[in-house]
């Protein structure tokens, strides 16, 4: 061993076993103590990352902030990492990881003139392989992590696109106990004599603290009396001494750790995805509107929403390992961001709607914004109100929907969001073909129809079947399950849709497990009597599997299941002319310390895989039933026929030979942390358990090879509203188009100097594409390597 770099830090979780305001107070206290020691000990260096903490100090203690700026110039205080905070790095999308970097970089460059080149994520519970490319493309030359411990040491991390970044997975922990730092430093040195250059972290952490006087003086005395070269140091200085030329190469996601966190606190995860989606969609709408109208993008308001999202991606909020108050605050924060983005989007939409002609008499216009740079064909929903309430008992108002050219499109009426039993509020579902990146126009005309003349559809006693030229979907009325799902003549699902219950414990992290396999039983179909009792109408005689919506567009089947004290309402929505099945589950969860999975049994199985940050993770080398993490989709790739499950905020699951098991929810206690042989939580009282009560889940089963764009549409849905335009202004057609469906337009953003577009090749081979931006008359021809990410600025 030639040299030891001591990196003093104060790991400070903004929220975890304490709420954010406690974290704010501790940040100020910790930074003040660290500044004192930096001023008192000339050789001492304090390192800290996370822009959000510096923002808090700047706002609430500006004098301390000025001291820190002076210490940064002197070199005693080093800005570390440069991100907004340490986010979860497996569930956070590639686009959000870019945002974490840009928010932090913008802040540190503006306030300190510093751009760190070593990224830091000590505490997150794993790292997507897509991050290797993200770091390389954003100017980082190295990365320091702590988990999973099986990767401890230095290595080259090779991304999906073959980009490479040196990584140090630290030995031991990022922190030390007060007065015990030297003891820890000595231990790490003794345990790893093989290391030529060693990185050793110390400082009281988790709830802040950082350096202490006794630790600094003990360490300085040790340095003075030791022949080994030991220095107070920083991340970049450590990597400057490391010879990376012969390091081993790692070509995989850096997982698993805390696999329960892929599922704990589903409401946080769903709200997180919803805000991710809305920011992406709103930014596209705002940029498109700015290019074709007088709209000025409110970048400061948008940044508030982005910071709300970034904060809730923190590695104890998004993973669900915080206390109940942290969950509640996280939901408030995400809702705050969503409210901002909804208003910004609506402003942009109204600008994009300019130039639409006024509606004719008796016509109700429907406007649909397609944010995507390609044509979308989708079943859409819209609600509007009749001009007058219709109080005629046996008569209903029916709409006919036309496209812009006057062609009738398939449509049907469905139950509205309200339960007002009056012909006034109307909900229409219609099949639409949408031009790229533009507002599309549809029109409705109305007529009154006698109730006896409304169409009716008949289904068999044992099965409910929906068939078209490409797909067959059959729901079994005796089981409530998907009996068969066939696309292109190939059977994809068989007896699928069981809701399975597994024994779990109080630990929301799932720290001590890699899978959940202690099977306890299935939810079973309710009897008809029990289903009517649950619905609140015991005197009725409806079936527990029944058609609740039907028409020319789709059939929706509802099935009710039960398990002990819990109930599941499953709705299958099957298009009359599509090739997918939408599944919406309302789960009333009342079992503690359980994992609940949704098992989709396939006909053939295949290679299990799922979306990761700007790429695809393969799980073929995992053990059977290992818990895995994915983003917008997962499924089986198979030459005989693929099958994938799209989601809107579900991140965990497992695979065996033929089953896709989506992890719906877990019910551990809040922040129940395993400690050696102790009980995880006290047994002498009632404890709050996570995800008890009503929860909602949304999935789409597809058999398409172009799964990435399908998942994008399912998450960033075309936006529909009934709106009567003025007829004024200039109508603009498709604003942005992209001619290769394997290349994904991830974002279109406003920057200080123009626009930024993020695209990535979602294929394991080279690709090319043309991006056309019509208002700027700009054609950009692009060549991509496999899984390559491109960030264009103009």
Regions found by a protein language model. Name each.
Residues 67-74, 95, 128-175:
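Surface-exposed loop and adjacent secondary-structure segments within mature catalytic domains
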Residues 1-100, 107-111, 137-141, 254, ...:
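N-terminal catalytic cores of secreted or lumenal carbohydrate-active enzymes
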Residues 9, 104, 135, 234, ...:
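Conserved, mostly hydrophobic/aromatic
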Residues 97-130, 134-137, 185-201:
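CE4/NodB-like, metal-dependent polysaccharide N-deacetylase domain
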Residues 89-107, 171-190, 555:
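Alpha-helical scaffold elements lining the catalytic groove of polysaccharide deacetylases
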Residues 25, 35-38, 220-230, 237-794:
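Terminal accessory/anchoring regions of large secretory-pathway or extracellular enzymes
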Residues 153-200, 204:
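Alpha-amylase-like alpha-glycosidases and glucanotransferases acting on alpha-linked glucans and related
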Residues 8, 46-55, 136, 149, ...:
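C-terminal domain-boundary segment and adjacent tail
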């Amino acid at each position: 061993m030639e040299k030891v770099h001591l990196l003093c830090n104060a790991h400070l979780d903004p929220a975890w076993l304490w709420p954010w305001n406690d974290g704010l107070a501790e940040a100020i206290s910790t930074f003040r103590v660290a500044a004192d020691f930096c001023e008192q000990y000339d050789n001492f260096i304090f390192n800290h990352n996370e822009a959000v903490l510096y923002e808090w100090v700047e706002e609430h203690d500006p004098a301390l902030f000025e001291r820190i700026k002076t210490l940064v110039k002197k070199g005693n205080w080093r800005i570390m990492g440069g991100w907004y905070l340490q986010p979860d790095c497996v569930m956070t999308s590639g686009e959000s990881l870019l945002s974490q970097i840009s928010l932090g970089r913008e802040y540190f460059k503006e306030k300190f003139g510093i751009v760190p080149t070593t990224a830091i994520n000590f505490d997150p519970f794993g790292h997507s392989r897509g991050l290797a490319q993200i770091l390389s493309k954003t100017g980082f030359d190295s990365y320091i992590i702590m988990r999973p411990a099986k990767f401890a040491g230095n290595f080259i991390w090779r991304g999906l696109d073959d980009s490479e970044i040196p990584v140090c997975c630290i030995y031991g922990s990022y922190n030390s106990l007060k007065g015990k730092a030297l003891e820890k430093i000595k231990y790490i040195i003794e345990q790893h004599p093989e290391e030529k250059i060693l990185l050793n972290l110390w400082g009281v952490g988790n709830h802040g603290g950082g350096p202490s006087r006794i630790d600094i003086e003990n360490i300085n005395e040790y340095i003075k009396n030791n022949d080994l070269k030991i220095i107070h140091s920083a991340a970049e200085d450590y990597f400057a001494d490391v010879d990376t030329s012969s390091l081993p190469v790692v070509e995989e996601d850096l997982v698993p750790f805390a696999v329960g966190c892929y599922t704990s606190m589903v409401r946080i995860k769903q709200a997180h995805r919803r805000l991710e989606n809305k920011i992406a969609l709103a930014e596209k709408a705002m940029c498109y509107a700015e290019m074709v109208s007088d709209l000025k993008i409110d970048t400061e308001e948008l940044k508030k929403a982005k910071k709300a999202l970034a904060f809730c991606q923190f590695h104890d909020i998004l993973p669900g390992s915080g206390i109940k108050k942290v969950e509640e605050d996280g939901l408030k924060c995400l809702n705050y961001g969503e409210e901002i983005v909804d208003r910004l989007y609506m402003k942009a939409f109204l600008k994009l709607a300019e130039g639409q002609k006024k509606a004719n008499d008796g016509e109700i216009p429907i406007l649909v914004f397609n944010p995507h740079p390609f044509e979308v064909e989708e079943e859409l929903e819209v609600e509007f109100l009749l001009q007058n309430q219709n109080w005629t008992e046996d008569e209903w108002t029916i709409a006919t929907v036309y496209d812009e050219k006057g062609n009738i499109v398939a449509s049907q009426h469905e139950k509205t969001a309200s339960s007002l039993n009056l012909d006034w509020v109307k909900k229409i579902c219609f099949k639409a073909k949408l031009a790229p990146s533009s507002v599309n126009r549809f029109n409705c005309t109305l007529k009154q129809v006698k109730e006896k003349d409304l169409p009716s559809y008949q289904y068999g006693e044992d099965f409910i079947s929906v068939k078209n030229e490409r797909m067959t979907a059959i729901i079994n009325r005796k089981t409530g399950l998907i009996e068969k799902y066939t696309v292109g003549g190939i059977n994809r699902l068989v007896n699928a849709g069981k809701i399975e219950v597994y024994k779990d414990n109080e630990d929301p992290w799932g720290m001590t497990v890699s899978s959940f396999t202690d099977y306890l039983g299935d939810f079973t179909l309710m009897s008809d009597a029990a289903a009517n009792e649950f619905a609140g109408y015991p005197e009725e005689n409806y079936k527990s599997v029944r058609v609740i919506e039907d028409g020319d567009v789709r059939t929706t089947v509802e099935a009710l299941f039960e398990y002990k004290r819990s109930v599941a309402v499953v709705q299958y929505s099957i298009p009359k002319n599509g090739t997918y099945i939408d599944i919406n589950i309302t789960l009333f969860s009342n079992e503690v310390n359980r994992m609940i999975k949704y098992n989709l049994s396939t006909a053939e199985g295949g290679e299990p895989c799922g979306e990761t940050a700007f790429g695809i993770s393969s799980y073929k080398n995992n053990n059977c039933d290992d818990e895995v993490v994915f983003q917008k989709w997962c499924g089986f790739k198979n030459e005989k026929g693929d099958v994938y499950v799209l989601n809107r905020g579900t991140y965990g699951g497992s695979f065996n030979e033929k089953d896709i098991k989506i992890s719906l929810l877990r019910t551990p206690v809040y922040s129940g942390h395993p400690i050696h042989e102790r009980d995880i939580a006290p047994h002498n009282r009632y404890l709050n358990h996570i995800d008890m009560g009503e929860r909602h889940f949304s999935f789409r089963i597809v058999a398409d090879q172009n799964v990435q764009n399908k998942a994008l549409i399912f998450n960033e849905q075309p936006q529909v509203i009934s709106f009567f335009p003025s007829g004024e202004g200039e109508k603009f057609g498709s604003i942005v188009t992209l001619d290769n469906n394997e290349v994904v337009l991830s974002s279109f953003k406003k920057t200080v100097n123009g626009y930024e577009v993020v695209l990535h090749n979602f294929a394991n081979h080279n690709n090319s594409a043309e991006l056309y931006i019509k208002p700027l008359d700009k054609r950009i021809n692009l060549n991509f390597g496999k899984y390559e990410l491109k960030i264009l600025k103009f």
